[in-house]
């Protein structure tokens, strides 16, 4: 599996703001928006392009555009915060949705929503979720996408835990990972250590629905 850890001072500074327990919802959202933009920029580096004649006010130049923009698939809830950064970089991308919550007792993903094109063959797919912890939610999402014919999938995560990275690498699914950091471990509650807490709660406040 191809793993790209984005090593850049601006990415590191935004990730630090997200990790900082003193950052309130507003500061966390702003840092996530900036870091999300940087990660999508890196993830899109190898997307196929096409060239065309672009008429400038002075002459004609060679223009470049994406040949086939990817579909952006956030894993709800926390992944919703990454839609705007992704669309700011790729405004003509389509968006699908996968809803996944975590059972706080078993730490297993609980799916509750699936809104995806039926046929994803030949499409690039960017799955966006701020955190890759155990890998359970992401693996479930990847299987849904692969079942629809997706063979070019990029997972974009702000922070990844080594156990989740290992689970992804051993899955045999067609995925590459773009992340800002790989943290070493999970605690007994399956939170990333040192991590950044619960990204959904820090974006939107505590989840108030029981599974």
From Swiss-Prot:
It comes from the Bacteria. One of its GO terms (molecular function) is magnesium ion binding. Binds 1 Mg(2+) ion per subunit. The magnesium is bound as Mg-PRPP. Its EC number is 2.4.2.9. Its cofactor is Mg(2+). InterPro entries: PRibTrfase_dom (IPR000836), PRTase-like (IPR029057), Upp_B (IPR034332), UPRTase/APRTase (IPR050054), Ura_phspho_trans (IPR005765). Keywords: Allosteric enzyme, Glycosyltransferase, GTP-binding, Magnesium, Nucleotide-binding, Transferase. Uracil binds at residues 192, 197-199. The keyword Kinase does not apply. Signal peptide: none annotated. Allosterically activated by GTP. GO terms for biological process: UMP salvage; uracil salvage. 5-phospho-alpha-D-ribose 1-diphosphate binds at residues 77, 102, 129-137, 198. Pathway: Pyrimidine metabolism; UMP biosynthesis via salvage pathway; UMP from uracil: step 1/1. Pfam families: UPRTase. It catalyses: UMP + diphosphate = 5-phospho-alpha-D-ribose 1-diphosphate + uracil. Catalyzes the conversion of uracil and 5-phospho-alpha-D-ribose 1-diphosphate (PRPP) to UMP and diphosphate. Belongs to the UPRTase family. This is Uracil phosphoribosyltransferase. It comes from Corynebacterium aurimucosum (strain ATCC 700975 / DSM 44827 / CIP 107346 / CN-1) (Corynebacterium nigricans). The gene is upp.
